[in-house]
């Protein structure tokens, strides 16, 4: 294989999966086949999409009810020749799912890139090992927290929040994805002020914290804004990838003048991936494609919290981010939304040590503030790695957190 193989979930009311698959393969490549003269068929054969796999799935009554018709469901795979497209994500997505995405009854499940095609993508600049080297933390999950309620607040408020989170033992603090360039907390001022706070905490407490600042602006201004952030001392760039496009992420990741990790936020991705019947699968969108395009971190809804993904999907995202691949470094999985210390044993069980535990309200909502919230998480992480049940840990911050949010791991065998 020198091109790409697309895997689709299809629904067909004519109950002929073979015909539907062939129509897709032709429609996204040469357009027609059987009515072409023999000579033209020979000329176009190397450009034709080829159906290589068809499996019928069991009938699904909920699907029939939703679509208001009886359909046959199936998984199909089509191989698209590399000759047909340039080696970039806009061309690949348009080839494999462009006008097909308008069908409304087809879901792009996966894309399998040939080695020849993979060579055209950067992958993460730092990856898991590189991020761990920056923090000098190699033996546990990382802990990340989020600035909360920053809109309409000034730099002084940001500095106080940042200091408390860092003292609490948080490894990474990220901007809220809805904090854009503004007069109260402009980009470079956030970075410079944040660096001062974090350096002070490091000198006093010996704990290093990185700050992920939100990279925003018009698309053609992003590189300039990113370079300004780097010059000001940015540790990490948070980026709302799907508001801009995967190719924009790749462009940032490939730029040698932007030598910092990139953290991909999933904002807007639900518009592409939320339906089970159409769109693009979450594992492909938030896992494989983000990694290939250069994300060092991928945030996605956890299977436990307030905006939950199904566990199978969340684990599939993580698999794509972390599986061995000779072409790409591994990206950090960041299962997010509604996370509190009681979920730490589940996160470590399901995602392993190479994960970023990301919390907002679970840190800021602690009775002892963000310092207490961070310490509760760090204690929960340490106890989990020692296989110690959280309810047996003698720690006031963790105990307070479990009283507020509960301890689901106490009720479930891990």
From Swiss-Prot:
<comment type="similarity">
    <text>Belongs to the RuBisCO large chain family. Type IV subfamily.</text>
</comment>
<feature type="binding site">
    <location>
        <begin position="360"/>
        <end position="361"/>
    </location>
    <ligand>
        <name>substrate</name>
    </ligand>
</feature>
<feature type="binding site">
    <location>
        <position position="177"/>
    </location>
    <ligand>
        <name>Mg(2+)</name>
    </ligand>
</feature>
<comment type="pathway">
    <text>Amino-acid biosynthesis; L-methionine biosynthesis via salvage pathway; L-methionine from S-methyl-5-thio-alpha-D-ribose 1-phosphate: step 3/6.</text>
</comment>
<feature type="modified residue" description="N6-carboxylysine">
    <location>
        <position position="174"/>
    </location>
</feature>
<feature type="binding site" description="via carbamate group">
    <location>
        <position position="174"/>
    </location>
    <ligand>
        <name>Mg(2+)</name>
    </ligand>
</feature>
<dbReference type="InterPro" id="IPR000685">
    <property type="entry name" value="RuBisCO_lsu_C"/>
</dbReference>
<dbReference type="Pfam" id="PF00016">
    <property type="entry name" value="RuBisCO_large"/>
</dbReference>
<feature type="binding site">
    <location>
        <position position="265"/>
    </location>
    <ligand>
        <name>substrate</name>
    </ligand>
</feature>
<dbReference type="Pfam" id="PF02788">
    <property type="entry name" value="RuBisCO_large_N"/>
</dbReference>
<dbReference type="GO" id="GO:0043715">
    <property type="term" value="F:2,3-diketo-5-methylthiopentyl-1-phosphate enolase activity"/>
</dbReference>
<dbReference type="InterPro" id="IPR033966">
    <property type="entry name" value="RuBisCO"/>
</dbReference>
<feature type="active site" description="Proton acceptor">
    <location>
        <position position="99"/>
    </location>
</feature>
<dbReference type="GO" id="GO:0000287">
    <property type="term" value="F:magnesium ion binding"/>
</dbReference>
<feature type="binding site">
    <location>
        <position position="176"/>
    </location>
    <ligand>
        <name>Mg(2+)</name>
    </ligand>
</feature>
<keyword id="KW-0479">Metal-binding</keyword>
<comment type="function">
    <text>Catalyzes the enolization of 2,3-diketo-5-methylthiopentyl-1-phosphate (DK-MTP-1-P) into 2-hydroxy-3-keto-5-methylthiopentenyl-1-phosphate (HK-MTPenyl-1-P).</text>
</comment>
<comment type="subunit">
    <text>Homodimer.</text>
</comment>
<dbReference type="InterPro" id="IPR017717">
    <property type="entry name" value="Diketo-Methiopentyl-P_enolase"/>
</dbReference>
<dbReference type="GO" id="GO:0015977">
    <property type="term" value="P:carbon fixation"/>
</dbReference>
<dbReference type="InterPro" id="IPR017443">
    <property type="entry name" value="RuBisCO_lsu_fd_N"/>
</dbReference>
<dbReference type="GO" id="GO:0016984">
    <property type="term" value="F:ribulose-bisphosphate carboxylase activity"/>
</dbReference>
<feature type="binding site">
    <location>
        <position position="338"/>
    </location>
    <ligand>
        <name>substrate</name>
    </ligand>
</feature>
<feature type="binding site">
    <location>
        <position position="148"/>
    </location>
    <ligand>
        <name>substrate</name>
    </ligand>
</feature>
<keyword id="KW-0460">Magnesium</keyword>
<keyword id="KW-0486">Methionine biosynthesis</keyword>
<keyword id="KW-0413">Isomerase</keyword>
<keyword id="KW-0028">Amino-acid biosynthesis</keyword>
<protein>
    <recommendedName>
        <fullName>2,3-diketo-5-methylthiopentyl-1-phosphate enolase</fullName>
        <ecNumber>5.3.2.5</ecNumber>
    </recommendedName>
</protein>
<dbReference type="InterPro" id="IPR036376">
    <property type="entry name" value="RuBisCO_lsu_C_sf"/>
</dbReference>
<dbReference type="InterPro" id="IPR036422">
    <property type="entry name" value="RuBisCO_lsu_N_sf"/>
</dbReference>
<feature type="binding site">
    <location>
        <begin position="174"/>
        <end position="177"/>
    </location>
    <ligand>
        <name>substrate</name>
    </ligand>
</feature>
<dbReference type="GO" id="GO:0019509">
    <property type="term" value="P:L-methionine salvage from methylthioadenosine"/>
</dbReference>
């Amino acid at each position: 294989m020198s091109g790409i193989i697309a895997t689709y979930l299809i629904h067909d009311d004519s109950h002929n999966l073979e015909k539907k698959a062939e129509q897709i393969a032709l429609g996204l490549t040469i357009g027609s086949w059987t009515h072409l003269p023999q000579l033209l068929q020979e000329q176009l054969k190397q450009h034709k999409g080829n159906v290589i796999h068809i499996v019928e799935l069991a009938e699904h009554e909920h699907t029939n009810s939703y679509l208001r018709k009886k359909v046959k469901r199936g998984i199909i795979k089509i191989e698209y020749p590399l000759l047909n497209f340039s080696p970039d994500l806009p061309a690949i997505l348009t080839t494999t799912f462009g006008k097909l995405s308008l069908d409304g009854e087809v879901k792009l499940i996966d894309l399998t890139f040939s080695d020849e095609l993979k060579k055209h993508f950067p992958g993460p600049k730092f990856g898991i090992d590189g991020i761990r080297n920056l923090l000098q933390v190699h033996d546990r999950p990382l802990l990340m927290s989020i600035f909360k309620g920053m809109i309409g607040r000034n730099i002084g408020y940001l500095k106080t929040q940042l200091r408390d989170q860092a003292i609490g033992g948080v490894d990474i603090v990220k901007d809220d994805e809805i904090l854009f360039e503004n007069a109260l907390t402009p980009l470079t001022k956030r970075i410079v002020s944040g660096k001062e706070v974090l350096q002070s905490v490091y000198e006093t407490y010996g704990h290093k914290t990185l700050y992920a600042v939100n990279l925003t602006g018009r698309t053609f201004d992003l590189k300039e804004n990113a370079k300004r952030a780097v010059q000001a001392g940015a540790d990490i760039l948070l980026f709302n990838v799907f508001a801009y496009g995967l190719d924009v992420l790749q462009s940032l990741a490939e730029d040698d003048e932007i030598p910092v990790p990139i953290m991909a936020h999933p904002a807007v991705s639900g518009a592409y991936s939320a339906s089970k019947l159409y769109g693009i699968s979450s594992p492909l969108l938030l896992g494989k494609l983000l990694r290939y395009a250069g994300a060092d971190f991928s945030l996605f809804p956890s299977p436990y919290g307030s905006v939950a993904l199904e566990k199978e999907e969340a684990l599939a995202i993580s698999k794509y981010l972390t599986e061995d691949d000779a072409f790409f470094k591994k990206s950090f999985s960041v299962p997010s939304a509604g996370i509190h210390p009681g979920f730490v044993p589940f996160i470590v069980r399901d995602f392993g040590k190479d994960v970023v535990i990301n919390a907002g309200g679970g840190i800021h909502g602690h009775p002892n503030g963000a310092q207490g919230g961070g310490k509760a998480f760090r204690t929960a992480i340490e106890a989990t790695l020692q296989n110690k049940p959280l309810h047996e840990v003698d720690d006031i911050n963790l105990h307070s957190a479990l009283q507020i949010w509960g301890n689901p791991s106490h009720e479930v065998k891990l």
